């Protein structure tokens, strides 16, 4: 698992939690069931609890589903310093940036959430090619500058079958 920026969803774990939560809602589970299943499916541990509580609160708030327990748990993480614990070794500017993110999250969570939103599984995008279609792709020099092992194939066409 990695973290690439200070945003609330700037890491693998927050995105996994959000995606799995939506997946459980798509399957027809209640918000409470979905939260429990996320914890189980992702095999989360105590060290993941602060991130889990913050992401769960954010997603539920956006969907109009946030319960008092979810809010209380998220505010506890924000109040007791657990939300910043994983940022102890980060640079001062990253810690300040993350704290601003958490401050905005607190403000949002303490504001009234919107109406309950219906969550539907997105329809898959239609692929414009049919199975068996052949696609021709030209390798252009701009994409392979400085890679001599690939430059020899520039301006040639590759055929791909769908």
Predicted regions and their residues:
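Short terminal alpha-helical segments
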Residues: 1-39
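Mixed-charge, low-complexity intrinsically disordered regions
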Residues: 6, 58-62, 112, 120-121
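Amphipathic alpha-helical elements of HEAT/ARM-like alpha-solenoid repeat scaffolds that form extended
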Residues: 2, 16-17, 48-62, 95-103
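Short coil-to-beta transition motif at edge beta-strands of beta-rich domains
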Residues: 125-145
């Amino acid at each position: 698992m990695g973290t690439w920026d200070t945003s609330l969803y700037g890491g693998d774990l927050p995105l996994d939690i959000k995606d799995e939560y939506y997946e459980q809602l798509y399957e027809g589970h209640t918000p409470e069931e979905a939260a429990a299943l996320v914890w189980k499916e992702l095999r989360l541990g105590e060290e993941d609890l602060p991130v889990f509580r913050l992401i769960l609160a954010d997603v539920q708030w956006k969907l109009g589903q946030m319960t008092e327990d979810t809010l209380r748990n998220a505010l506890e993480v924000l109040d007791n310093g657990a939300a910043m614990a994983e940022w102890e070794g980060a640079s001062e500017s990253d810690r300040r940036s993350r704290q601003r993110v958490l401050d905005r999250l607190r403000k949002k969570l303490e504001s009234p959430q919107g109406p309950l939103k219906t969550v539907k599984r997105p329809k898959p995008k239609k692929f414009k090619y049919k199975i068996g279609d052949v696609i021709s792709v030209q390798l252009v020099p701009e994409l392979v500058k400085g890679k001599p092992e690939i430059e020899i194939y520039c301006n040639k066409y590759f055929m791909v079958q769908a």
